[in-house]
C-alpha cells in the first residue's frame, strides 16, 4: 500500500511517501527549486519520493492533502464579515486567488498531478483531505516511539485551530480541545517578528536567536495589553493591537505606540530595543507553553508528550519543556511546520482511514530525518564539472580535514 502526502500552497510545500506504513521518503520543494519556503505545487518533491521508491503515480493507492481549503475559506469569510467594513482592502486582495484557484484546489491538484504523470485525471488514485492540525498531530504522534502520548500542536492557524490537544493511543488520535483564530500564539510571535523587521513565517528563528541579547523589559506590558493568559495556559489576544485578521500587516499604529515607534523596516540595523522586545516575547511564549504542558499532563495523565506545529520549532521553549515540564520524555516532529503536514496527512490515511495496526519498535519512524535525496561519492565528484569555482578534495578523515580548514580560516580544496 502506497500513500502520498502533500503539503502546498501556503508555505514550505512538501511531499512524503508512506509504503506499507513506513515513511519511505520525504522532501521539501525548496530543496529542489532553491526558493526559500517555496509554496508552489511540490512537483520536484513528489517526483523524488516516487523515484526513491521506484514507483510511478499509478502505483499510488491514496493521495492525501494536509488541510481542508473550503473550511479555511469559511474562516476567511466569517472573519471579514465579523470585522466589516474594516479589512475591505485585505478582502479585495485575498479574494481573487481564492475565487480563481484555491476554491478549486481539488481540481487544481488533480490537474498538476495528472500533468506530471502524463495520465488523465480520471486515472489518478483517490484524493483525500485531512484537517490541518490533525496532520500536525499525526506527524508528531504516529512517527513517535510512544504507544500512548499527549499531543500538543501550536502554530499560526490551520483552518480555524491555532492550538490543539490530542490523546494518541495506538493507531488513534482523539481530539481533546482547541483554541481558535484569531487567538494564536504563533501569530503573536509572528507579529513581533514583523515588528522587529524580520519576515513572517521565515524570521521567527531570528527573534528567538536575538532574545538572549536582550532584557525582558516588556513582559509585563505584553501580558497587560496584548494577551490575557489564564493559569491553565489558555489565552486570548487583544485584537485592538493587531492587524493580521483583516489587514495587510501584522500590527497596527496602536501596537507601534505601545512599543515606542513604527515597525522596523526589513534589513534595518537591530538596536537594543529590538533585542529587549525579542527577549520579552520569548519569555512570554515559554511561560505559555509550559503552562499548557502542565494542563495537558494534568488532564490526560500520560508520561509522554509529542509536539508539532510551527511553535514547536522554538527549541529554547522545547528545552524548558524537557527540563521543567511534567512529562518523562517528549518527542518533537523534526519537520514541525507545514512541511511535516505531508507526513502527517499520509500517516493519518494509513492508521485512521485504513485502520492499520501500529507497531512500536522503541524508536521513532523518521530514520534520523534522513528522508530526502542522498548523494554518492561519484555524484559529488560531478559537481565541480558543472561549477568551475568548486574543487574536489578527497580525504580518508573528513573530520580532521574540516578542523584543519577551520583553523586555517578558509575553505577546502588544494
Q: Positions of the model-derived regions?
A:
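Short acidic/glycine-rich loops and adjacent helix/strand connectors
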Residues: 1-391
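Short stretches within intrinsically disordered, low-complexity N-terminal or propeptide regions
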Residues: 18, 394, 398, 402-404
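Acidic-residue sensor for enzyme active/binding pockets
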Residues: 286, 394, 407
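Conserved small/polar residues in nucleotide/adenosyl-binding loops
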Residues: 388-395, 412-414
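Hydrophobic alpha-helical segments, chiefly the membrane-spanning helices
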Residues: 400-414
